[in-house]
A protein has these predicted regions:
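Membrane-embedded alpha-helical bundles of multi-pass transporters/translocases
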Residues: 2-458
Length: 458
């Protein structure tokens, strides 16, 4: 029996459920937490940006540390990562509720409490994402299985985006928020956002449990080497792999681009289109394209090859920004931007995760150790530091431009220009780098070379 037949639809749907639940929180937090800090808690945008930057730096630092712990730890049932989905889902759901809780502290106390909660949230998120980032490689060694699993993960991400962003205004309104025809998120939305976060937390728990009870770790390390790995040794192994280094830069570009766009879209909707709810149809457009692309990506990859697929995705991200740059107030510009972002970002997500799965195999051939958790945890350190820099750039640009929540729709002309650049010129420049890096990635070639070298030494 082929390995491919081992991964049934039920298991892939479990990946989809888990990806949906985690992306609910990720996208809900990405889209609404910054504006919650500035418009509900009344924290200055510069301070709020610093909070997110500190939190993201902490998230970047804890990634390789937690990944190293995971690589050196085995659960009593012999598994490496799957049980984290069971043990961490409830604590993580609680932290997302706390993130959107208004404790009415005011001033510096609100900022300090926010950072503390954010630290716990990010640490638990890292533990919970061990299955999310590593289990595809541990479920099967078949490349088609892995691409299919990553496509289901991407599809789950789209559904998570739908629940966490497109449907959020509806849920907030259901709980009594966003009142008025052109409502902008404000202090009166504190309780509705809190109740929405409770709903999101419950959905996350359900998705994580579904994934835990439907998945299985099948791929085991071939050698019996169980020596503990130190942090420096882990990074020596990672940086010796050319594919890991290039894929790290590929992921950095993806993270910066999505962080800028997802954190800027609500400001564009609120202060350029006149209503926070205007983000809903734009995100729906992005979501539909992402869903279709998730289904098609494995077939595109199989037809034209991984490198061409990655390059085409990057080119789509570049082309999609051109109409928006020249006509930023045009509905066509913003919707075409959303469509191409849905295609390009989704293909990039599936590709870099499939690359990660191959890289885990490459490293095993090179070092006689499977370090699946470190493949993702290692590159997350640098990519999240880059995202932190992107968020810091965004908020400092807005603060310098004179953004002031109390001005409502009367923001300065410089603020409007800044918001437009965060959705246009800046992510376009990042996409140029994405295409350049994608052109040089060839994981299949390095995998075959490493496999041949390993066979000669045995």
């Amino acid at each position: 029996m082929s390995k491919k037949s081992e991964v049934k639809l039920r298991e892939k749907l479990g990946f989809l459920a888990f990806s949906t639940s985690t992306n609910i929180v990720f996208n809900f937090k990405n889209l609404y937490y910054l504006i919650f800090l500035t418009n509900v808690l009344k924290i200055p945008v510069g301070t709020a940006g610093t909070m997110l930057t500190i939190g993201t730096i902490w998230d970047a630092i804890n990634d390789p540390l937690i990944a190293l712990f995971t690589a050196n730890h085995t659960f009593k049932n012999g598994e490496k990562v799957r049980p984290f989905a069971l043990y961490c889902c409830i604590p993580w759901a609680i932290t997302i509720i706390l993130l959107f809780t208004n404790f009415h502290l005011g001033g510096n106390l609100a900022a300090i409490a926010g950072v503390a909660i954010y630290f716990v949230f990010e640490a638990l998120y890292t533990f919970l994402c061990m299955p999310y980032n590593s289990l595809a490689a541990l479920t099967s060694k078949d490349d088609m299985d892995r691409k299919s699993i990553n496509a289901y993960r991407s599809l789950g991400g789209c559904l998570g985006s739908g629940i966490g962003s497109v449907l959020v205004p509806v849920i907030v309104k259901m709980f009594g928020g966003l009142k008025g025809e052109n409502a902008i998120i404000g202090e009166g939305d504190s309780i509705p956002l809190f109740l929405t976060a409770c709903t999101m937390g419950a959905l996350c728990i359900v998705g994580s449990l579904i994934h835990y009870f439907t998945s299985k770790e099948r791929v085991k390390q071939e050698s019996d080497n169980e020596d503990k790995i130190g942090l420096f040794e882990a990074y020596r192994m990672l940086f010796s792999c050319k594919s890991w280094v290039l894929n790290m830069f590929y992921i950095i570009c993806y993270g910066i681009s999505t962080a800028l766009v997802m954190n800027s879209i609500n400001y564009y909707a609120a202060y350029i289109m006149g209503s926070s709810a205007a983000a809903t149809p734009i995100l729906a457009c992005y979501l539909v394209m992402a869903v279709v692309t998730s289904i098609l990506t494995p077939m595109i990859d199989e037809k034209i090859g991984r490198r061409k697929t990655m390059v085409i995705a990057g080119l789509a991200l570049i082309v999609g920004k051109i109409p928006f740059i020249f006509a930023p107030y045009s509905p066509f510009g913003i919707y075409f931007n959303a469509l191409t972002m849905g295609f390009g970002a989704t293909v990039t997500f599936v590709m870099f995760n499939t690359n990660r799965n191959n890289i885990a195999d490459i490293l095993e051939y090179q070092n006689d150790r499977r370090i699946d958790s470190l493949v993702a945890g290692g590159d997350n350190l640098v990519s999240k530091l880059a995202e932190a820099g992107a968020l810091s750039l965004m908020t400092s640009m807005m603060a310098s431009a004179g953004f002031d929540e109390s001005l409502g729709l009367g923001q300065t002309a410089e603020t409007i220009k800044t918001i437009i650049s965060l959705l246009g010129v800046i992510p376009m420049a990042v996409a140029v780098v994405t295409v350049t890096v994608a052109f040089f990635i060839n994981t299949k070639k390095e995998l075959e070379e490493s496999k041949q070298k390993a066979s000669l030494t045995k």
